[in-house]
Amino acid sequence: MITKTTRWPSPAKLNLFLYINGQQENGYHELQTLFQFIDLCDHLTITSNQSGQITLAPDIPGVKTEDNLIWKAATLLQQHSQCEFGAHIEIEKILPMGGGIGGGSSNAATVLIALNFLWQLNLSNDTLAALGVKLGADVPIFVHGFAAFAEGIGEKLQPATPKELWYVLIKPEVSIATVDVFTHPDLVRNTPKQPLNALLEATYVNDCEKIVRSVYPEVDYQLSWLLEYAPSRLTGTGACVFAEFNSEKEAQDVYSLIPDNATGFIARGMNTSPLNRTLEEYKSLCKI
């Protein structure tokens, strides 16, 4: 066990496009989507110990410890590996909850990667991803750490290299539950599957966007505002919307115009997760 206190990034993701191709008998939706990381991150400071307990600080308002994906991921890893070690995890929360940028899933993946290293379990990323998918369909993308085209229910990943553009994100003052979007009777569920090359060359679309804009006027308002300046879309099932730019200056210029009552961020697209880089840095330090 490595007892050193370590600090780990937990990055957000964007769905650059999202198409829903059908629905399985178990209720899960078949989809095609393109994931890319952005350099907007929560951070987790983790200290492993021999207590066997998983403790978190600070509490997240409205979220019980046993419902927190950070605690769930650590406990799941303990149980799977029969590890008797524990950890104290401090959370620096930047990513908005209910935003469609993968905050909870990313936190879970960061815990799996970090504790696998700190507890010296030596589990493969495939094993960690298989554990992670029990916590959420997006967790494997954060475990593997590369931008990817995803199919199936999101578990079939193919590495991809979309342009690493600059983005302006706005988080409307609503929190959207994924289940509410995917169970909406008017959701498009029959977009024909297409080869990746065709999807990459087409105009990017999110099949959830029409429903979300109709049900949540605040999302519609913010997305309409962004569309005045650049190509813009919903990410995931929302509520975050984003506009894409070729340069940081273009993004900064539009970001400076965001209304005072809106919560916004500037971020850079990343095809390799910063979590991967941090893990490699800690591995190198341990060899010295």
Swiss-Prot record:
<dbReference type="GO" id="GO:0050515">
    <property type="term" value="F:4-(cytidine 5'-diphospho)-2-C-methyl-D-erythritol kinase activity"/>
</dbReference>
<comment type="pathway">
    <text>Isoprenoid biosynthesis; isopentenyl diphosphate biosynthesis via DXP pathway; isopentenyl diphosphate from 1-deoxy-D-xylulose 5-phosphate: step 3/6.</text>
</comment>
<feature type="active site">
    <location>
        <position position="138"/>
    </location>
</feature>
<keyword id="KW-0418">Kinase</keyword>
<protein>
    <recommendedName>
        <fullName>4-diphosphocytidyl-2-C-methyl-D-erythritol kinase</fullName>
        <ecNumber>2.7.1.148</ecNumber>
    </recommendedName>
</protein>
<dbReference type="InterPro" id="IPR014721">
    <property type="entry name" value="Ribsml_uS5_D2-typ_fold_subgr"/>
</dbReference>
<dbReference type="InterPro" id="IPR036554">
    <property type="entry name" value="GHMP_kinase_C_sf"/>
</dbReference>
<comment type="similarity">
    <text>Belongs to the GHMP kinase family. IspE subfamily.</text>
</comment>
<dbReference type="InterPro" id="IPR013750">
    <property type="entry name" value="GHMP_kinase_C_dom"/>
</dbReference>
<keyword id="KW-0067">ATP-binding</keyword>
<keyword id="KW-0414">Isoprene biosynthesis</keyword>
<dbReference type="InterPro" id="IPR004424">
    <property type="entry name" value="IspE"/>
</dbReference>
<dbReference type="GO" id="GO:0019288">
    <property type="term" value="P:isopentenyl diphosphate biosynthetic process, methylerythritol 4-phosphate pathway"/>
</dbReference>
<keyword id="KW-0547">Nucleotide-binding</keyword>
<dbReference type="InterPro" id="IPR020568">
    <property type="entry name" value="Ribosomal_Su5_D2-typ_SF"/>
</dbReference>
<comment type="function">
    <text>Catalyzes the phosphorylation of the position 2 hydroxy group of 4-diphosphocytidyl-2C-methyl-D-erythritol.</text>
</comment>
<dbReference type="GO" id="GO:0005524">
    <property type="term" value="F:ATP binding"/>
</dbReference>
<feature type="active site">
    <location>
        <position position="13"/>
    </location>
</feature>
<dbReference type="InterPro" id="IPR006204">
    <property type="entry name" value="GHMP_kinase_N_dom"/>
</dbReference>
<keyword id="KW-0808">Transferase</keyword>
<dbReference type="Pfam" id="PF08544">
    <property type="entry name" value="GHMP_kinases_C"/>
</dbReference>
<dbReference type="GO" id="GO:0016114">
    <property type="term" value="P:terpenoid biosynthetic process"/>
</dbReference>
<dbReference type="Pfam" id="PF00288">
    <property type="entry name" value="GHMP_kinases_N"/>
</dbReference>
<feature type="binding site">
    <location>
        <begin position="96"/>
        <end position="106"/>
    </location>
    <ligand>
        <name>ATP</name>
    </ligand>
</feature>
